[in-house]
């Protein structure tokens, strides 16, 4: 998920500058339209990059996003949390636990049921919160991408189930950063890797209390914990992208934007909570401010519920 306030135009301008600086990178042809540059592909962090090689042939759906042939996550998707760092006494564990326990089957998450695979099988829209564990700084306080994968591997080796239909979230406390660009390039990301012979989908989401101006929508929040409430929207963003584009080769547009990227930092109609903060949905007994997601129907549009 890209930073707050970083517009699509700025993201693309920055990527094009990098491409121009690397004169050895060829301009690739579009697989469907000769003479047109190729679709960019997602990097799981909120913007697209040039494909390193041949990509799946896009099947335009007329809804502003195309299917590229890769798998999607069917049936009930498992969510697993790895609480990295120091979360002692922090209400984030209950706020985000309640999010994972109630987002499945909600009008919000049913937006993802508008996505299907090449066999005409649709995302179910069901989610189950299946487990969590803690990691007290095993990889230090500045995590490389490799270290984040190691955190996931260690959690699996320590007892979390190896679930090919699950998404594992590495949730870091505010004293932890990610050296590849947390707070400077992104607020969260998702990817996948073969771990112990299983295709594991996992995500990094940092605590936006570390950089409120970049990764928090508001500093007063409906659950009284701005960092956790900010993480809730980022977790939702990465979860819906992992479900519809788990291996970064399924659903995205010609800029390399996945479904949630297309609606990042937009929230639709909001209401005011008693403490003055804004929220746009209720999941279980809690109010949340969660970004909109892209509906893959009726021409495509951002929404907080479907149908």
List the predicted regions and their residue ranges:
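Active-site recognition of the HExxH zinc-binding catalytic motif
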Residues: 233-245
């Amino acid at each position: 998920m890209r930073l707050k306030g970083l517009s699509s135009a700025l993201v693309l301008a920055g990527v094009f500058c990098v491409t121009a600086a690397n004169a050895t990178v060829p301009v690739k042809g579009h697989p469907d339209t000769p003479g047109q540059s190729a679709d960019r592909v997602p990097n799981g962090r909120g913007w697209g990059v040039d494909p390193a090689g041949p990509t799946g042939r896009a099947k335009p759906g007329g809804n502003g996003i195309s299917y590229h042939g890769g798998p999607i996550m069917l049936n009930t998707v498992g969510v697993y949390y790895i609480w990295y760092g120091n979360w002692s006494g922090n209400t984030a564990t209950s706020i985000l636990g309640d999010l994972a326990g109630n987002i499945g089957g909600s009008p919000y998450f049913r937006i993802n049921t508008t996505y299907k695979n090449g066999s005409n099988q649709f995302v179910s829209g069901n989610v189950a919160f299946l487990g969590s564990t803690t990691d007290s700084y095993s990889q230090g306080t500045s995590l490389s991408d490799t270290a984040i994968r190691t955190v996931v591997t260690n959690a699996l080796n320590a007892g979390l189930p190896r679930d090919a239909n699950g998404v594992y979230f590495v949730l870091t406390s505010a004293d932890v950063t990610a050296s590849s660009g947390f707070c400077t390039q992104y607020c969260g990301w998702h990817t996948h890797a073969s771990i112990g012979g299983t295709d594991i989908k996992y995500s990094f989401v940092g605590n936006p209390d570390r950089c409120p101006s970049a990764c928090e929508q508001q500093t007063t929040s409906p659950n009284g914990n701005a960092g956790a409430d900010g993480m809730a929207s980022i977790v939702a963003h990465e979860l819906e992208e992992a479900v519809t584009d788990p291996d970064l080769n399924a659903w995205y547009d010609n800029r390399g934007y996945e479904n949630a990227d297309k609606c990042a930092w937009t929230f639709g109609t909001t209401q005011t909570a008693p403490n003055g903060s804004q929220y746009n949905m209720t999941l279980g007994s809690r109010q949340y401010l969660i970004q909109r997601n892209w509906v893959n129907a009726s021409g495509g549009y951002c929404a907080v519920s479907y149908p």
